[in-house]
């Protein structure tokens, strides 16, 4: 009886292995490409960003001070929505509401942990719009409020709901960080 | 301490800068109300990250970071003093070229020996704080350019803008100060057609920026103090960014509707044309009902393929596939979108899955086919085993006949 079954059970096992192997080959291996990109950012008045007392400042950097410049990390969410961060996405820009007061904050959140579908992460979302070579960012959680710098140097980067104000700059240039 | 830090930050954030147009800088320094020993019971807040990098023979201002935009002198219960790290003397006492006004230390003119660390001490009734500011005074030579130049960027073929930086204190003190722009050693006067005045003398416009416009520029402001004129120079390195670096991505495929059989495996490539440039930072990804694929399908029924970049006939493409394994009825009602994005532009293309019933699907046929093969195999094996079993049965019969024969003689 054993002699009779032996060779055919081997064949059956081989067939099953082939099937599973075929199945395994269908699933692609390898890591998913990271969607975070680092950019050099400067406003239309040639000011760049740097940190002072854990606050994002816009100013003019010269000589060795240029190494203080903060690059912006951007993660696209949708066609025109992005998350913005610095320090490799470990600090994220967000719009904070306290009563009627609107403030730009830097929160210690990993940018890759943010999700568009979570309501609490909406404060980190910015709507990006291009006008010619420049880009502006409107907060999704605070509609009508735009990322801005002041004309005067060494003042904090903040949010404004009066983007046409002459002493306010809401337009930025980008360059991929090489 | 944390509350104090927040308070200082808050004060800094909400302070409104006042535009003061004083005719001349007051010569008399603010004398301290009581004798102070610097460093005594003061909280040291650290070093200001930005160093002050200036040229010798020119006026220099150091701004105390502790109260960067408030006028200290207006507060009757607080005052601010400056000292140099290697000296126990307060600044105004032993050096006529230096004086303090508000939160700003003036050095006019600066010499190379003024380089060093300066400490500002902010004191009021309740507390005392200190911070340090680094000053480096360079020789006014070409060798100093890399150390003092501001980096500014303009895009090719656009109207470029140069800004003469960090002149706020001098402009407010000397409103009629004249500013001249130079490229290298060449004065860019009003007759120059390529360079335009922006009205504001601290700005220079470059019409139709070209690669030749890159290089070192200088803006020089004349500053008058006590009847004597000084130059205030800012060096700027202009870099020209080529606009052709980043192409506008064009999504070539997929089609608006993709025919598929339910239960089948489906691969939909999103193919993006990137032009003929050397490199691109374009990223491509899929969305299902505006949700990332990995978030919409955590179990992996639908997955995103690898980012595949390649060239065909000197044209650059990037491809990311959407993989269904298998297609379900749910997919017929889902909006699938491929997005291509780079610093210059974002493009997207919608597509939907449409059921095709007539299409023969191998994966559907595979399961019953396997079953049939197994059944047929089993039957065939049984037949072979039955033959051998038949033989065995015959042998048994013979033995039975033998047993019957001996019993009959009895």
Swiss-Prot record, chain A:
Pfam families: IL1 (PF00340). Residues 1-26 form the signal peptide. Glycans are attached at residue 110. The keyword Glycoprotein applies. Disulfide bonds join 92-142. It comes from Mus musculus. InterPro entries: IL-1_CS (IPR020877), IL-1_fam (IPR000975), IL-1RA/IL-36 (IPR003297), IL1/FGF (IPR008996). This is Interleukin-1 receptor antagonist protein. Keywords: Cytoplasm, Disulfide bond, Glycoprotein, Secreted, Signal. Disruption phenotype: Deficient mice still possess other negative regulators of IL1 activity and adapt to excessive IL1 via shedding of IL1R1. The gene is Il1rn. Anti-inflammatory antagonist of interleukin-1 family of proinflammatory cytokines such as interleukin-1beta/IL1B and interleukin-1alpha/IL1A. Protects from immune dysregulation and uncontrolled systemic inflammation triggered by IL1 for a range of innate stimulatory agents such as pathogens.
Swiss-Prot record, chain B:
Disulfide bonds join 42-128, 64-120, 164-219, 270-338. Residues 14-355 are extracellular. Residues 1-13 form the signal peptide. Keywords: Cell membrane, Disulfide bond, Glycoprotein, Immunoglobulin domain, Membrane, Receptor, Repeat, Secreted, Signal, Transmembrane, Transmembrane helix. A soluble form (sIL1R2) can also be produced by proteolytic cleavage at the cell surface (shedding) involving a metalloproteinase. Strongly expressed in B-cells, with levels 21 times higher than IL1R1. In T-cells expressed 5 times more compared with IL1R1. Glycans are attached at residues 124, 208, 231, 289. Residues 382-410 are cytoplasmic. It holds the Pfam family ig. Residues 35-136, 146-237, 249-357 form the Ig-like C2-type domain. The chain crosses the membrane at residues 356-381. PANTHER family: INTERLEUKIN-1 RECEPTOR FAMILY MEMBER (PTHR11890), INTERLEUKIN-1 RECEPTOR TYPE 2 (PTHR11890:SF3). Belongs to the interleukin-1 receptor family. This is Interleukin-1 receptor type 2. The lineage of its organism: Eukaryota, Metazoa, Chordata, Craniata, Vertebrata.
